[in-house]
Amino acid sequence: MSFTVLIPARLASTRLPDKPLADIAGKPMVVRVAERAALSGAERVMIATDDARVQQAAAAHGHAAILTRPDHPTGTDRLSEAVDALGLPDDAIVVNVQGDEPLIEPALIDAVAAQLVAAPHADIATCACPLADAEALFNPNVVKVVCTADRRALYFSRAPIPWARDALAGGARVLAPGLPAWHHIGIYAYRVAFLRRFPALSQGQLERYESLEQLRAMEHGHVIVVHHTDSAPAAGVDTPADLERARAAYTNRL
C-alpha cells in the first residue's frame, strides 16, 4: 500500500495564534505532527502551509514543506494545490493529517489509507469510534456519522443521529443501549483525482446548514467509507489548555 501524508498548516488561528509553530518539548507542533506521520507506512510526508515561517521551521528539523497560496477557503483546497505541485498521479492516495494533531497514532493513518484502498468505489475514507455517552450524542461539536453495513457513510451531522425514538421519548437525553452511534474523527484519505475536482464543487445546502465540509462531497455524489476504531484518539490542539495537555504528554514520553 502506497500513500502520501499531507499536513495542511495554516499559521493564522483565532484561538491559538501561530498554532503550527507552538513549542512542544522543544519542537514546533507541526514538526511533531510530521514526526508522528513519518512513523506510519507513508511513502512521503509533506507539510502544506501558507507561510514561509512554517516552511522554514519544518526544514530546520528535516521535514519537507510546500508553500501554498494564502487564500484557500479550506484545508482541502490547500491539498488540491499541493498535489498538483507535487505532480501526484490521479490514482494516488493522500492522507490528510491535520497540523494540530501532535498525538495522532501512526496506526490510525495506516488504517484510514487501507480503508480507501479496500474500497475502489470510494473517493474518500475517514474514521469513527463509538459515541462515549449521551452528552456526546447531544453535543453539536461532536460530529456523528451513520453508515451502511459495509461502512459507507450515509450522513454526517451535528444532531443526535440515529434518533432512538423510544428511548428519547418525552425529552429523555440518554444513549440507548446498542445504538449504532458513531463519533466522526477528522482524518481523511483521498484519491488525488477527487482532490483535483474538489475546488470546483459548489457548496450545497447541507454543508451550509451543518457547517461540515465532507457533506459537499456527498451532495455531489462522492462515496465516503468509514474505518471503525474501538476508542477515540487523542484530541487535537485548539485551545491553550489543549496545548498544555499535548506538552505534558510529550514530557511524559521523554
Curated annotation (Swiss-Prot):
* UniProt pathway: Nucleotide-sugar biosynthesis; CMP-3-deoxy-D-manno-octulosonate biosynthesis; CMP-3-deoxy-D-manno-octulosonate from 3-deoxy-D-manno-octulosonate and CTP: step 1/1; Bacterial outer membrane biogenesis; lipopolysaccharide biosynthesis
- Reaction(s) catalyzed by this protein? 3-deoxy-alpha-D-manno-oct-2-ulosonate + CTP = CMP-3-deoxy-beta-D-manno-octulosonate + diphosphate
Q: Which InterPro entries match?
A: Cytidylyl_trans (IPR003329), KdsB (IPR004528), Nucleotide-diphossugar_trans (IPR029044)
User: GO CC: one term?
Assistant: cytosol
| Keyword RNA-binding set for record | no
Q: Report the top EC class in one word.
A: transferase
Q: Name one GO molecular function term.
A: 3-deoxy-manno-octulosonate cytidylyltransferase activity
Location(s) in or outside the cell: Cytoplasm
**Domain of life here?**
Bacteria
Q: What keywords would UniProt list here?
A: Cytoplasm, Lipopolysaccharide biosynthesis, Nucleotidyltransferase, Transferase
EC number(s) on file:
2.7.7.38
So what does this one do? Activates KDO (a required 8-carbon sugar) for incorporation into bacterial lipopolysaccharide in Gram-negative bacteria.
User: Known PANTHER family for this protein?
Assistant: 3-DEOXY-MANNO-OCTULOSONATE CYTIDYLYLTRANSFERASE, 3-DEOXY-MANNO-OCTULOSONATE CYTIDYLYLTRANSFERASE, MITOCHONDRIAL
Annotated family = Belongs to the KdsB family.
| The protein's name | 3-deoxy-manno-octulosonate cytidylyltransferase
Native source species? Bordetella pertussis (strain Tohama I / ATCC BAA-589 / NCTC 13251)
